[in-house]
Amino acid sequence: MPQFRAKARAVDLLGKGQISDLPTAISELWKNGYDAYGDALEAYIYLSGYENIKKPLFILQDDAKGMSRKDILEKWIVLGTDSKTRNEIDIKGEDTLWKEPRIKMGEKGIGRLSVAYLGSPMLMLTKKKNEPLQILYFDWRTLENYNLFLEDVNIPIASVISSEDFKDKFKKIRIDFLDNFNSRKEIVDGKEVIIDFWQEQFLLKDTII
């Protein structure tokens, strides 16, 4: 039976379609930080040439409760998660960092896409209490390839257990991300064929790699 499928660029359009400008993008992400019981919500912009920085760097950070690997896989990369739509009420405890429950401010399941407006590539670091640090690497420009479906896109995630472990894991997820640009074998009409999603998108590919 036929089913709906979504092109990868639908995520790009959905995210940017909700955002009118940079301040709005930052505001939406801060709302998500507030909803996660953060109090110190900060943003920093470093321009090329500062402290040997070669390209402009934007940092957005908070002291919220963070995410585990399970949270990322089941919530952050799942569009339209419905906890806010259902108006679920938090209960004061470890999940609220022992703060009083808050009225949710962020968009219902798509506010996180605001980060795409801030630039590419993106490195996300998040840590939940009693869980290892999680790092996620992605370049939002990948979604501009109209040949890709959502299921074709690889989003590398790794758990980091120490500061010494960070460098190796960061290198690995950057390499894993490049798998998005490799040709793939698929079965079409009972025959194995090689699919290259980037054959017509080489200019976009060059800007990312």
Residue locations for each model-derived region?
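GHKL (Bergerat-fold) ATPase N-terminal catalytic module, capturing the glycine-rich phosphate-binding loop
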Residues: 1-209
